[in-house]
């Protein structure tokens, strides 16, 4: 990115911050190093995988976002990938305020126990509950995640991108739904917001599932299913603790990713397939694991739930693939760091 593009991006960021009366804080890699070094000296536990090796090698992409989630003091966190921009209203042509819509989703109740066929009954412009919806369930529960969607380039895995290289998402549906309790979903980290206090410990986006060497070599910041894994953890924990997860608006516009544009869509997808193939295969067994996972009554907050999932991963999935033993170690390191930071707040 040249200086002109950086200046333009900074102007867009500042305008967004002013619109929502927010402050900005720029954190460099050196700032992150100092913070994690200080945190390590305070910790009484020693892990096989350190937080520094997890988040700083390299300090880009999902590692940066995960570090931000860890140290943020905000109640709500809104996160977008660098290749998305605000989508436009198809009627008026005006840019949609994705931040405001995410916050509206999080601040309104969710209905995970009984599906309302008229979309989100707690949305400001909703017509409410349909006939037959139990009155005892209409109060809803706290929403801990708002999962947005995208227009433009679909968030495909590599095999699908190979067979559908020219496919584009063009249909805009102005709706929000609560994902029912017991149902899992594939989270996309490109457009998501969450309640940091209630579900934040689940939002580690860098584990290296099926590609554990990338954790240490610095050749990749994550694998293609790391954000999906975070979503599976978050949904299971939300169900266990009695919270809700919403999906739908806001939309963002997703442009061509560099890996898909340098040598053409198919060539980029073929290159991605080399790193995605194993994680995608493992996902076929990971999803049933989460579908049958049951947390104990002793797990009463997201930190405890995440640590308990880490132990289950180590006990039940490491026989499936050696990378899961390291995934469990990463999760344990993250859970302890989260507790250490937030116990001091």
Q: Language-model segments: which ranges?
A:
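Terminal low-complexity segments of carbohydrate-biosynthetic enzymes
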Residues: 1-21, 25-29, 34-37, 41, ...
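Active-site-proximal specificity loops/subdomain of glycosyltransferases
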Residues: 2, 9-76, 89-100
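Alpha-helix N-cap/helix-initiation motif
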Residues: 54-61, 219-227
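Basic, glycine-/proline-tolerant helical and adjacent loop/strand elements
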Residues: 82
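Conserved donor-nucleotide/metal-binding helix-loop-beta segment in metal-dependent transferases, i.e.
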Residues: 86-135
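Short active-site alpha-helical segment characteristic of glycosyltransferases
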Residues: 230-233
């Amino acid at each position: 990115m040249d200086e002109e593009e950086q200046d333009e991006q900074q102007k867009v960021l500042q305008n967004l911050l002013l619109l929502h009366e927010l402050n900005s804080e720029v954190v460099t890699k050196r700032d992150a190093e100092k913070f994690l070094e200080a945190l390590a000296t305070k910790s009484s536990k020693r892990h096989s995988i350190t937080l520094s090796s997890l988040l700083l090698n390299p300090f880009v992409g999902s590692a940066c976002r995960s570090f931000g989630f860890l140290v943020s003091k905000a109640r709500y966190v809104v996160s977008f990938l660098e290749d998305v921009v605000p989508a436009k209203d198809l009627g008026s042509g005006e840019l949609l305020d994705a931040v405001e819509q995410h916050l509206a989703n999080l601040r309104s109740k969710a209905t995970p126990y009984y599906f309302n066929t008229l979309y989100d009954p707690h949305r400001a412009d909703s017509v409410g509950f349909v006939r037959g919806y139990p009155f005892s369930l209409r109060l809803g529960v706290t929403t801990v995640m708002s999962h947005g969607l995208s227009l433009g380039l679909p968030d495909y895995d590599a095999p699908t991108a190979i067979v559908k290289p020219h496919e584009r998402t063009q249909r805009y549906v102005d709706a929000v739904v609560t994902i029912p309790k017991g149902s899992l979903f594939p989270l996309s980290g490109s457009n998501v917001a969450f309640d940091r206090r209630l579900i934040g410990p689940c939002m580690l986006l860098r584990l290296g599932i099926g590609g554990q060497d990338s954790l240490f070599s610095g050749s990749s910041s994550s694998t293609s299913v790391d954000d999906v894994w975070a979503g599976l953890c978050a949904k299971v924990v939300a169900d266990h603790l009695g919270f809700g997860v919403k999906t739908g608006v806001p939309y963002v516009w997703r442009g061509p990713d560099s890996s898909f544009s340098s040598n053409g869509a198919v060539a980029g997808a073929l290159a991605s397939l080399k790193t995605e193939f194993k994680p995608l295969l493992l996902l076929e067994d990971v999803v049933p694991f989460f579908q049958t996972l049951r947390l104990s009554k002793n797990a009463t907050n997201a930190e405890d739930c995440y640590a308990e999932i880490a132990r289950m991963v180590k006990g039940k999935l490491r026989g499936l693939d050696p990378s899961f033993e390291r995934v469990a170690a990463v999760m344990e390191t993250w859970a302890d760091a989260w507790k250490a930071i937030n116990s001091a707040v």
